[in-house]
Amino acid sequence: MREGIFMSLEESEKRQEGYNKSLSSKIKKWINDSLTLGEMEARRLRHDPTELFTRAVQPVLWLLVFGETFTRIKAIPTGGVPYIAFMTPGILSQSVLFISIFYGLALIWDRDQGIIQKFLALPVPRSAFVVGRTMGAAVRGLSQTVIILLLALIIKVDIRWSIFSVLGTIFVVVLESAFFSCFSMILASLMRTRERFMGIGQVLTMPLFFASSAIYPISIMPKWLQVVAVINPLSYVVEILRSILITGVYENMLLHLGLLIVMILVAIIIATLLYPRLAS
């Protein structure tokens, strides 16, 4: 009887080992698939590097014109921080938002060219497609981050330069790119034409930007707009970046970071579920 029990235990252990190996191999395959797709997306940027500079024009104008002007006027309360320093994290977030939220346009283009259909025929998890796309968006977002921070250095914006601030900024920009590119993929899955997607994207970007703490504190907004700003993911991104780069006050940073990560996970799940609709 004992021998039978030992044999059952051994068989159970072998099955568990096989399951663990299978799970481990699946995870490794998923990571490799995601990285491969992310690399493919990054190559598109290498083939058209002028996109980096054309997209950098708007944030540069915001900092040089709007930022310098309102720093002199001193019309917006910033808690003793120079206005141009206050708005720099907001303009960085805006730039990443604008790049990421129109990322779904490339998906619609790929669908019209029949590329999405070919991808979906591959033995690759749908979530790997979504995560790979977010990696491509993150590369674009980080490239804009470099340009904006270099400009901030040139015009002598008072930024807290340190290893922590640089690594923290990279991490937050990747998170922002992930969320808004997933949001863009969700929109692309629901839109049938590029024109409709562009229209919806343009309608959403400006409210997301102005209904956040990017260029003014939430406290000076009307009450109804404060409610919108509190549930706006861009507000969390701006506040985290402002804590890291400008104020050094980390009181609510972990809360904002946690909420942002939860939003990203939900967005990835929804984008994964809707991704096959792109082929139809």
What is the predicted function of each stretch?
Residues 45, 100-124, 134, 280:
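Transmembrane helix boundary and interhelical loop/hinge segments in multi-pass membrane proteins
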